[in-house]
């Protein structure tokens, strides 16, 4: 039993760790792309729009890989932690379902518009698409963190006669003090990751005297976001 539990933990830990590499960068790049689109809209300088298009391609690829690596993690709730899922499913399934039904579809729908609809949407419509992708990605992070925070610090629940859990206050689950702290920590880490990735690529381009104009934008936006 102890060996099986250890294997389950290692298995799940590897899956979660590998998966989180991708949504962390996705959530970090989303607000930076909005910043680039905002600067392009206000200044009418093509360099900002071109920079946003460049990072949007990376965002799109990273988003797809993040979705694919997240599917095995969901399956492992049943394969590795079946009894836990059975007992607590009435609680943790709520934020996880909202992540899929609301924020994931919001992000996915507007990402499609953002990737392929620039010419049809116009500049302001394209900016709104970028902003909604940002909102969707950060909402996804919030619902996932809320589910994790409840596992660490259970609130707003009752135990039923069969031993399972039920929610007594959905807002109590979402406003869990641990969830708010974890969410702030997670989003700061994601933003720093995205900022450093952008600044690092810009620095690499500058060192190689390649696309200097874009490289300066990458470094400036990345460093400012990372420091702030």
Task: Write out the residue ranges for each language-model feature.
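Polytopic transmembrane helical bundles with strong interfacial aromatic enrichment
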Residues: 1-228
């Amino acid at each position: 039993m102890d060996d099986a539990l250890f294997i389950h933990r290692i298995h799940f830990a590897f899956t979660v760790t590998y998966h989180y590499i991708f949504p962390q960068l996705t959530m970090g790049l989303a607000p930076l792309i909005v910043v680039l689109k905002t600067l392009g809209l206000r200044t009418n300088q093509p360099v900002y729009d071109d920079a946003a298009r460049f990072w949007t391609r990376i965002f799109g690829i990273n988003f797809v890989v993040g979705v694919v690596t997240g599917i095995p993690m969901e399956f492992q709730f049943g394969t590795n932690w079946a009894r836990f899922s059975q007992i607590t499913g009435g609680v943790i399934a709520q934020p996880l379902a909202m992540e899929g039904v609301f924020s994931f579809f919001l992000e996915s729908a507007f990402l499609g518009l953002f990737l392929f609809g620039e010419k049809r949407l116009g500049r302001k419509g394209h900016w709104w698409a970028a902003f909604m992708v940002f909102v969707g990605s950060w909402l996804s992070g919030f619902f996932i963190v809320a589910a994790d925070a409840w596992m660490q610090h259970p609130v707003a629940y009752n135990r039923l006669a069969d031993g399972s859990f039920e929610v007594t206050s959905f807002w109590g689950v979402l406003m869990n003090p641990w969830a708010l702290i974890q969410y702030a920590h997670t989003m700061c880490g994601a933003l720093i990751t995205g900022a450093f990735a952008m600044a690092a690529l810009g620095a690499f381009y500058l060192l190689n005297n390649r696309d200097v104009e874009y490289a300066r934008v990458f470094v400036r936006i990345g460093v400012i976001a990372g420091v702030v």
